[in-house]
Structures are given as structure tokens and as C-alpha cells.
């Protein structure tokens, strides 16, 4: 009898927050991503509409994966976010606003490269929105590269 090979799966969370209620107005905001199983939490300030920041958060996470590909090359990557719009627009035939198309196009290139899945999760379960206290105290044996994430390809 042959053994069934199961590919490891890793859950990653992305988030974007702005101060103003108007999600279409360009403003200062916070992008973040978390990989709880690895004890990774990344947060950075950025500028854009709330919807742009959601894409920028996804792109920052994908850039992190690209920079640290050896750590993720044999993993199935499940990206979870609290944005139904982002999940919808990243589906194959979705319509996207003109101002978001540049970000979406780049994210779709990454999607082909890394074969990640993108799903919705309620804000209360989005680990990228929470603080460091919610992540396990792991001694990380991997040498991750965070430095080049801010070199924005978007």
C-alpha cells in the first residue's frame, strides 16, 4: 500500500486599517500580515485608500514570501483576510475598480507564482489585526528577510 503524501499548509493573515470612515479617500493607514505558526507579525504605515491598502498588505505579504521562498516552497499557503471585496476581486473573472487594477494585476502574477488561496475571515479572527500578545512565543530558527519588503513594487 502506498503512502499518501500530505503537503504542509500554513495560514497567513493580512489586514489594512485606516482612521477615516471613508474607505475611498486616500489617507495614512496601517498594513499588516501575520504568520502565527512561525511567530511572524509585520506592520507598516502606508498611504492610500482603504481598498488600496488591502491590496498593498497582500502584496507586502507576497513580497515577504518571495524574499523568503526557501522557507515556504513546500507549503500550501492559505491567506486569510477580512475584506470580502479583496477576496472577490482576486477571483478569476471579477471586475475591479480602475485605481485598484495595478495592484490586482501584480497580485495575480504572484498568485500564479505561489499558488496561494485567498479566503475571507471575520475581523475578530484575523490575527494580523491583533497584537504580538496573540502570537505564540516561538524561538524562530529561520532567518527571514524583512528589509526589502518596503521596496514597493506596487
Please provide the spans of the model-predicted regions.
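RNase H-like nuclease fold core
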Residues: 2-52, 64
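Compositionally biased, intrinsically disordered/low-complexity regions enriched for serine, proline
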Residues: 5, 33, 133-134, 150
